[in-house]
């Protein structure tokens, strides 16, 4: 147990048998007003906002699966989702982590049961998958190690469902400074990986960055990466604009 004497964030390092692990830890203040003001006014709003999408129904994602963690769960089960991005297939698990991909200790929920990711993608019949994973690994594991596990997941999906198009979404920043720096480094690895392999790369994270590179207070519900309704609406707009750009 760690006892906080004041609000803020720090790092904890543990070592055992020659192995060292470091993680970021935050302690938020009690009220929402205190939380909103803790990091100062420069953290209130994002540096960029997406343009207003063109009106009309969006069906681009109706044949897509969305692979992710609890943040993706927020996206897919928020009121207004169908009007914003249609009816994608949810392939997620709360607290999802790519660390559990190589040994199948982490799988996704599909049709009310636990499936290996690649088998769920193949069985779902989707033509494309949108993937945002890695946030729960960063802060515990390095961007490079997280990326290696991400590649393993993609390799398995391509082997099992080679016809499916891969869309990689950049991972959202955190309210924690060190984790946001790790996330930025991880996103750069994903961006280059997508370019090298002709995958699609969807720039989501840049619309969720305050001037200090962290998640804006107005978008963060918990000081990390879980979203407020305002943040979810922003993500909807990013995806709507992306769909419209692909259909032009």
Please give the residue ranges for each predicted region.
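N-terminal secretory targeting modules
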Residues: 25-67, 71-77, 246-247
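Charged helix-capping and loop-helix junction motifs
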Residues: 144-153, 182-187
């Amino acid at each position: 147990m760690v006892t906080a004497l004041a609000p803020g964030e720090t790092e904890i390092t543990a070592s055992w048998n020659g192995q060292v692990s470091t993680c970021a830890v935050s302690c938020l203040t009690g009220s929402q007003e205190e939380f909103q003001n803790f990091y100062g006014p420069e953290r209130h709003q994002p540096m960029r906002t997406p343009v207003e999408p063109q009106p009309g129904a969006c069906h681009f994602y109706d044949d897509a699966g969305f692979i992710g963690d609890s943040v993706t769960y927020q996206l897919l089960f928020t009121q207004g989702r169908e009007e914003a991005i249609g009816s994608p297939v949810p392939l997620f698990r709360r607290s999802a982590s790519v660390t559990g991909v190589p040994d199948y200790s982490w799988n996704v929920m599909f049709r009310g049961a636990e499936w290996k990711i690649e088998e769920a993608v193949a069985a779902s019949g989707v033509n494309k998958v949108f993937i945002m994973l890695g946030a729960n690994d960063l802060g515990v594991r390095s961007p490079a190690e997280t990326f290696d596990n991400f590649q393993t997941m993609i390799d398995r999906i391509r082997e099992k469902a080679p016809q499916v198009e891969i869309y990689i979404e950049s991972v959202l920043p955190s309210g924690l400074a060190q984790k946001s720096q790790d996330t930025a480094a991880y996103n750069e690895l994903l961006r280059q990986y997508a370019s090298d392999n002709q995958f699609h790369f969807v720039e989501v994270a840049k619309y969720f960055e305050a001037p200090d590179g962290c998640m804006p207070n107005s978008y963060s519900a918990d000081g990390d990466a879980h979203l407020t309704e305002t943040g979810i609406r922003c993500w909807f707009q990013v995806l709507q604009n992306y769909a419209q750009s692909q259909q032009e």
